[in-house]
């Protein structure tokens, strides 16, 4: 098990730009020791025959094919515009 000292906690806090009150240093020291103890347990697991992965769950591409469908004619769409100029929508100038 990795032993964490209060100076280690102060150093990590400094690197993270955290201001820790002195009365909380001991609490964080104990918590970090528990976390690293858990990591040590994970290191003991045999992963020799486990294939590497990038995700916990297999991701399947569920997208459909992008098919072009004509629902309205160009003329129908242009006729719905409040302002039209030839084959274009006329919109207010924005500047």
UniProtKB/Swiss-Prot annotation:
Keyword Membrane found: no
Encoding gene (name): gatC
EC top class named in words: ligase
Species: Prochlorococcus marinus (strain NATL1A)
Disulfide bonds: none
Listed EC numbers: 6.3.5.-
Subunit structure of this chain's protein: Heterotrimer of A, B and C subunits.
GO BP of this protein: glutaminyl-tRNAGln biosynthesis via transamidation; regulation of translational fidelity; translation
PANTHER family xrefs: GLUTAMYL-TRNA(GLN) AMIDOTRANSFERASE SUBUNIT C, MITOCHONDRIAL
Protein known as: Aspartyl/glutamyl-tRNA(Asn/Gln) amidotransferase subunit C
Keyword line: ATP-binding, Ligase, Nucleotide-binding, Protein biosynthesis
